[in-house]
Amino acid sequence: MAKGPNNAAQRARKKVKKNVADGIAHVHASFNNTIITITDRQGNALSWATAGGQGFKGSRKSTPFAAQVAAENAGRVAQDQGIKNLEVRIKGPGPGRESAVRALNALGIKIAVIEDVTPVPHNGCRPPKRRRI
């Protein structure tokens, strides 16, 4: 019982182009990768990009340049959706924190607020042991 080609076309979703003027850029900068998600005010994702998804593998993912390329890619897609103003929320200690924000700014998107939302424990879980190199 073969499925017709019509069935596959129904499953493939067409990207809906939204017209959103301002949103939030969530930058998650870990030591291994940088993830940029651009959402509207309600938190619905408009675009996202990762350093690994831009073709960087291994230790090159954790570079500021990889974060810059990922931010440019996510920002361009968001601009196509109509984004003009952004709040930037940065989470994590990674090397791509600053370069991701600079890349978004260079695209011509107006950045209103830069906020650090890195979670800090009030002495919660025991951290991993110290690395000895």
UniProtKB/Swiss-Prot annotation:
GO terms for biological process: translation. One of its GO terms (cellular component) is ribonucleoprotein complex. GO terms for molecular function: rRNA binding; structural constituent of ribosome. The keyword RNA-binding applies. InterPro entries: Ribosomal_uS11, Ribosomal_uS11_bac-type, Ribosomal_uS11_CS, Ribosomal_uS11_sf. Pfam families: Ribosomal_S11. Gene3D superfamilies: Ribosomal protein S11 (3.30.420.80). Belongs to the universal ribosomal protein uS11 family. NCBIfam families: PRK05309.1 (NF003698), uS11_bact (TIGR03632). This is Small ribosomal subunit protein uS11. It comes from Cupriavidus metallidurans (strain ATCC 43123 / DSM 2839 / NBRC 102507 / CH34) (Ralstonia metallidurans). The gene is rpsK.
